[in-house]
Amino acid sequence: MDNKTDHKNDLNSQPVPSSAPHKERLTPMMEQYIEIKAVNSDSLLFYRMGDFYELFFNDAIEAAQVLGITLTTRGKHLGEDIPMCGVPVHAADDYLQKLISSGYRVAVCEQTEDPAEAKKRGSKSIVRRDVVRLVTPGTITEEKLLDPTRANYLMTLARIKTSKGEEFALSWIDISTGIFRVTESHPEKLLADIMRVDPQEIIVADSFFHDKSHKSLFNVLDRIVSPQHVSLFDAVTAERDICSYFKLSTLEGVADYSRSELSAIAAAIRYIEKTQITHRPPLMRPERQNENATLFIDAATRLSLELIRTTSGQRDGSLLKAIDRTVTGGGSRLLVDRLIAPLTTPSAIDKRLDSIAFFLRNTSLAEAIQLILKGGPDMPRAVSRLALGRGGPRDIASIQRGFEIIHGLNQLLNNELLPQEISDVQQVFSHLPTALHFRLEQALSDDLPLLKRDGGFIRPNYHKELDEMRALRDESRLIIAELQAQYAKETDIKTLKIKHNNILGYFIEITNLQATALTNTPQAKARFIHRQTLANVMRFTTTELVELEGRIAHAATHAMTLELEIFDTLVHEITEQVDFIRKAAEALAILDVSVALARLAEEQEYCRPKIDQSLTFRITAGRHPVVEQALRKQAAEPFVANNCDLSVQKNHQYAAIWLLTGPNMGGKSTFLRQNALITIMAQMGSFVPASSAHIGVVDRLFSRVGASDDLARGRSTFMMEMVETATILNHASSHSLVILDEIGRGTSTFDGLSIAWAAVEYLHEVNQCRAILATHFHEMTALTEKLDRLYNVTMKVKNWDGDVVFLHEVMPGAADRSYGVQVAKLAGLPTAVITRATDVLHQLEQGETAGKGNKLIDDLPLFSLKTTSLINEETNKHCMLHEALKNIYPDELSPKEALEVLYRLKQLEKK
């Protein structure tokens, strides 16, 4: 989760004057601003003034700094200039994005009446304004503010105190798509559950937030937590409020929610109503998540494996980046959902794998589907914007385009023998509302404006009256010319003209001599109404011309009104189909992910894993999905594949544990991570980077690879290591997979060895889980003699002319040394240090063998002038050799000359 500065508390103490005192010193507009600001003190106030949103006082100072806009002043208060800045309404989304990403909440205050209406109440009356929406990180819907590849979750965290202790529940909503989920949680897995969902904003009761016993949790979550009054989580009225929102008489038959779940759900609904104010987004009914249905991955493991983002927060370098071949926003979001919550039911996993296998066998069909899907619209987000009154013509077009894609895919899949998951997708597509699809095709213009107020989005010939209004608006000159010709013919006055001015409007003009034709009979007088007489001309009008003038004058306004009415009708029809649209969008995402994973499997030569309920863990020629692709991009040496078999061996009841030794840089951490990632990929329903894989479902995955201090909570690297190790030992079951790298390295040798030794014994005897443990404590390899399911494996290395070559192969056996000095040499440590380290290591090893370690350490000489001199001589020798080699050109030497050169080099080496 991003660590950005939290400005919410700053806004509570802004020096905005009270709305009560000093009113006589403020303009009516500023009085109104202060009254509205007082109710929204925890948010920046976007105060609508014509075509701008304006901010005042500290709001202006803060916003100007973040947005990089000019800070100016408007008026004075108590003799001081009032700071002010503003942003154009048409560009507000861009500025909102910057403010939200910087940790601010924004209250959007709009004019709620026309200025003309305000004047009717008195010349000094000001336009009414109200806050119509609170914009927060978890409640945004605008396309510009959202990442199309990422869900935007608002989470509520409820705590219920009972006689037995505390009960917790989480609910999370993506207001932009309508997704609504809920689950119970427990103190020990609360952080893991939150990190799995990865919300943009978390709502908690203020009493919970300030509870010191949970301080560490909220320190980790940092700025994304928004404390609210405890009444938001009231469980007593929760069921009533939930039923009211979803128009239900009772929750019976919907779900048997716990009290804590009801509190979390109700809090989410109340917060949505609080922030959206005038609109209720169409949410799905809360779907309960079964905690046992998905692979549990704790927060530390999720971070260290870099599933969605790297430890530095980047998408590049993550597993998601390596496997994502989706072509739609919905598909990308579904892939993330699957990646963060792998399944634990083999039949459900196989259902997904069947889809991938189908598209691998039908590559032409897969290519055709991906071509149709590519660049497809984000229907759930479009329909949410429309339902919230924030949508435009292009959102309606997104629905129409989505329907078109569904129609095409339905025809493409109709005659195929499909696997279950894709058959279900096709079944959803078959219920396309064809009448609405046809109406949208007929209604929408080809060239659509961004905003509905710009008009012109309804196609000609769709609505007769609208066509007439547009004709009057756009073709008024032609209509007047036709009427002028009609009157000229009727009166036999060829010079008759229809003209216009701001006083009379449209009128007929003839000379005084011609006026007789319009006034000589009662019928003519009744038809042509006299308006004005000038020196040489007379002016008339007709009932027809007056009516036409009125119609022309109001044509543009009426055309816009009609177009907006049609827009609202279409929006209503679309929102009536919201359930289908969401199901169809989910089906499109499933199709996108299935085809994308098939493409990945073919491209990277992945295999289908066998998944069952056994304790098997057998990977043949497994590879690290991220590292392998990185090496290919760099045109480096190919990735070295390795086997891993933690399965139950003959005459044993439980699975094996591998104890991995070997040098740094040998590939131990990569091997550990790749097996964890293969497990996640297999259980999310993906093919995996191996030649074969058989995995008994893993219920919990623990991976402790890498280490860092947690300075914010005062924890050292070693303390963090011990906390994470405690979590593993306390919660791993026989169906779990544990990946541990260098346990005990953060303390003294004997302390570390003792802890690592005891932890391995505990995993073997108590947890009885599948595990791979990497260590530098070579003494631990002796444990295989007493623990019958513990096996020694090592990273293969090769000595070549005094240097070490890492082969990155895992083989049976134990390493006899760590090759730390050789790695230091590769890293470029000074020759003096390497020479000295080699000498110290040699003497320490001799001392350990003889049992005289401490004495030898005391006897070891420090760097001396003699040592330095020898090192300098060695350096000079290398320089001479280097110079000699630099002046040799092998292609120009005869065999005899080459032999002479070799002798000279040999002489240099002996000096």
Swiss-Prot record:
Keyword Hydrolase appears in the UniProt entry: no
The family this protein is said to belong to: Belongs to the DNA mismatch repair MutS family.
Keywords: ATP-binding, DNA damage, DNA repair, DNA-binding, Nucleotide-binding
Stretches for region Disordered: 1-24
Basic and acidic residues biased stretches: 1-10
Organism: Bartonella quintana (strain Toulouse) (Rochalimaea quintana)
Function statement: This protein is involved in the repair of mismatches in DNA. It is possible that it carries out the mismatch recognition step. This protein has a weak ATPase activity.
Protein's UniProt name: DNA mismatch repair protein MutS
InterPro entries associated with the record: DNA_mismatch_repair_MutS, DNA_mismatch_repair_MutS-lik_N, DNA_mismatch_repair_MutS/MSH, DNA_mismatch_repair_MutS_C, DNA_mismatch_repair_MutS_clamp, DNA_mismatch_repair_MutS_core, DNA_mismatch_repair_MutS_N, DNA_mismatch_repair_MutS_sf
Highest taxon of the lineage: Bacteria
Binding sites annotated in the UniProt record for ATP: G662, P663, N664, M665, G666, G667, K668, S669
GO-annotated molecular function: ATP binding; ATP-dependent DNA damage sensor activity; damaged DNA binding; mismatched DNA binding
A GO term from the CC aspect: cytosol
CDD domains the record matches: ABC_MutS1
GO terms (BP aspect): mismatch repair
Transmembrane segments: none
SMART domains per the UniProt record, alphabetical: MUTSac, MUTSd
Pfam families assigned: MutS_I (PF01624), MutS_II (PF05188), MutS_III (PF05192), MutS_IV (PF05190), MutS_V (PF00488)
